[in-house]
Amino acid sequence: MTIWVDADACPNVIKEILYRAAERMQLPLILVANQALRVPPSRFIRTLRVAAGFDVADNEIVRQCEAGDLVITADIPLAAEVLEKGAAALNPRGERYSDATIRERLTMRDFMDTLRASGVQTGGPNTLSPRDRQHFAAELDKWWLESQRKK
């Protein structure tokens, strides 16, 4: 089991939660990005730098993740691809993607893209709140407990 992070867009506060969790759970945590990242010294935490470019980090995560892994991403198409491989996917707000919800999320994403392309101002996501951080940490722990039961 490995935790993969789509690190270019992952908020720093979520990375901090993941650093602590990797140590506590003694699980590999791999942050994939197209830029250099600073991470705390740990035998469990490493970075994987990829070339800059559209979806390069996403494609590398899809290529390397396996069933049973966890992928942290707000990228809905990436989440859909890793779910197909049998990995779990969690966004930085603590929402766990599932086979049951991913189609709806993809449809909504495509609809919002269409609105933006036609000139409609859709705004961005709200700032990550303390409640979002707590929800993320709770869902991360829930995933960990579920994965331990499956062993």
Curated annotation (Swiss-Prot):
One Pfam family this sequence matches: DUF188
Superkingdom in the source lineage: Bacteria
CDD domains: PIN_YqxD-like
Transmembrane segments: none
Entry-linked InterPro entries: UPF0178 (IPR003791)
Annotated NCBIfam families: PRK00124.1
Annotated family: Belongs to the UPF0178 family.
Descriptive protein name: UPF0178 protein YaiI
Organism: Salmonella typhimurium (strain LT2 / SGSC1412 / ATCC 700720)
